[in-house]
């Protein structure tokens, strides 16, 4: 059986660990990078009917869609599995960042924001609490439409490598705004599991893998 997973550089450890666990259980895991194109490709593979489970760990494309970054996947991300009835785990991974190109390509209106230079061609901008509230509302709205078995997992300590404590995108208020909005807008019957961990902690990655197996 084929499982698809969404990954970013900042969620590599989480996806890698979950992938190992699932492969040991006999699944084939195909990883898609959440670059806009990657998210759309994953959605279309799910629509094709070849996928048995979805490990949607990286939701970052919504931040680009909302704020105007360069890696948006369009307005239909997180729809295919719900419509196709495919069991899904959803994590709001990397909703702490918007992707831009070289620093001089970042719109002037964001000049006062917090940035991280991932490499000379990639500039990341920290989402603020207001944006995170809206992202939580958008993601919850997509999940509310699922007819498939779905569980939402929240890593309360960090949504990426660089938002962990001591790192440049650590922002408790922004993360809390996101988590609160997801909880507030989700239908009550949708299961939400919280873990006091960072997204790349092996315990959280194993929780992702086990939770998907439980749904399948």
Show where each model-derived region lies:
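A solvent-exposed, charged loop/short amphipathic helix patch at secondary-structure junctions
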Residues: 106-123
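Long amphipathic alpha-helical segments with strong coiled-coil/leucine-zipper propensity
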Residues: 96-97
